[in-house]
Amino acid sequence: MDFRSRLGLLVAAAALLAAGPVAAQEKPAAPAGVTPAAIAQGDSIFHTKGLCYACHGTNAQGTVGPNLTDAEWLHGDGSLDFIVATVTSGIPAEKAKKGVPMPPKGGSAITEDEVKAVAAYVYSLGHK
């Protein structure tokens, strides 16, 4: 192998090594349903008719309900499906933080599509 070939291989290897840490830091793509529009709608519902802010705080960092921004999922795996199921069904008192239950849909009259939007917003908070 001549000098030019070895130099080319060395440069290519250095480029791959340099790209490695950047590629490792990329977060996985959000699941279908977690779109900017769904997140914005969910944010609005969370802070208004969904009443989520009453227990999770206006910054979603928790009050009587748990912090939703720390990527620590207390009752499941943090997947979008898990969040949808949790918002839909709630959390019983015996499993809830501080023993305060989360009623289904947070006790508010939100639709299935609104539940999905809230779930997209919550997903975005815990998967930064």
Tell where the protein language model's regions lie, with residue ranges:
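N-terminal signal peptide c-region/cleavage motif recognized by signal peptidases
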Residues: 19-21
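Electrostatic cytochrome c docking/interface patches
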Residues: 24-47
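The canonical Cys-X-X-Cys-His
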Residues: 42, 49-58, 102-103, 118-122
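Axial heme c-ligation environment in periplasmic c-type cytochrome domains
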Residues: 63-71, 90-128
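Bacterial N-terminal signal peptides that target proteins for export
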Residues: 1-11
